[in-house]
Amino acid sequence: MANDNNNIQITDESQIVLYQPNESISLQVKIDASHDTVWLTQQQIADLFGTKRPAITKHLRNIFNSGELDQNSVSSILEHTAADGKTYKTQFYNLDAIISVGYRVNSINATAFRRWATRVLNNYLLKGYSVNQQLLAMQRQFDSRLEE
């Protein structure tokens, strides 16, 4: 079962990021900065990857059954306000689940997502490595000056 003691209210004040893999698809993703993640419903994940909701349900079930992810850790019942102004409780999945599903779905949008995720990860790793090397060099210079 989902982690429902973590009822997070998604409000208009949440940071919104627009992910647009191509001209025909754009998805607004609400960032939950307090938990360093994003939350999407199964339908939003299906829209993101250009597939149907039953495919997402199947992939999530396989991910949880295989032990790849723990359902209690990556899903939560969240409250959201619909267009009718009413608040509903809906099951949402965090970034870990979204990425795992993205690597299982076979669609053009999922392939675009995988390319994007790989590019972001490569940039992060390479820039992070570069920054760390610069910091180490600065530390060595500082240490050598202290020794003088």
Residue ranges and their predicted role:
Residues 68-83:
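Short Lys/Arg-enriched helix C-cap and helix-to-coil transition segments
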Residues 62-66:
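Alpha-helical DNA-recognition elements
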